[in-house]
Amino acid sequence: AKVTPERIAVVDAPGLGAGRKAVRFVVERAPNSFRSEISLPHEAGFRERWYAARVLVPEDWVFDPARARDIVMQWHAIPGNGRPTNPNLAISIGNEHWYVEQAHGDPAGKKVRTNTELGPVKRGAWVSWVVHAKWSPDESGVLQIWRDGDRVVDRTGPNVYGTIGVEYTPY
């Protein structure tokens, strides 16, 4: 879809004080309207990275239990022959709750998926997320996630697809 001011825009950050800015993403609940995102350039090899974002779920957000969860942030690796369809890591919302979703392993064979519920969404309140990932298809992988300064995920082990043919840090 074409980038338009209705889909993505820099705006004054609600409730964060004068001069504070935010990027507003809008995705209409309509057929063929499912994504609005920023992506980073891919990097060869698996890397250790830190990411941070503040997220505001508006007061008027509608949770639709008939739909899948809404992914708020995701990290995808470059797909290879197995064409993985699930992100290696996603922070999502559904049924009024936050979730961390992970997928790794062999996308053409034994894929491992986990879902962790992180508690209720507070509409109209900013949530600060910090993600520390040492991306790896083996036991050297690390995933730590903080929500508003509290560590909510602390895992070691595989966290990327290890057999896609090319190693890329998820973006």
For the regions a language model picked out, list residue spans one by one.
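Low-complexity, Ser/Thr/Pro/Gly-rich disordered linker/stalk regions
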Residues: 1-171
